[in-house]
Amino acid sequence: MIRLCPITHGNLWQLAALDVLPHQQEWVSSVSVSLMQAYCTLAGGGTALPLGIYEDDVPVGFAMIEFDDLPDTENAPIAAGNYCIRRFLIDARYQRQGVGRRAFAALLDYIRTLPCGPAPLCWISYHTDNPVAARLYASFGFVPNGEKDGIEDIAVLKL
């Protein structure tokens, strides 16, 4: 069973050790970099929720949710008042086993509880040369909106 868990001193190093396949590293930042980004967001007064993804008691992935505009950074127009799945990764050892699909469903279920407050939309960005991610997000109802977050395409889901 998939569980989403907060990052603690007890699981930090297990989660930091998670990694994607070598060819995927250009598409997603590491857990360590993600945690630094979360720290900067939180220290600046923004909202970031880094989460470990567990299959039973085994850490299999990492996700990070953000809410609203981020402080001290250029924000995509869609960011204002909405949720963002800033990071989603499944460790290389657990890919191609359905873990990613189950984890993404659990993450969306959590976001739909509106943990940071009400919002009409959730958005995610991805590299155009990552068709697996594009198909996964589309299968959950995310639709490209024509905007970019840096060099990444943005897709949006109504909550």
Show which residues each predicted segment covers.
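Acetyl-CoA-dependent GNAT
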Residues: 2-86, 91-93, 104, 110-116, ...
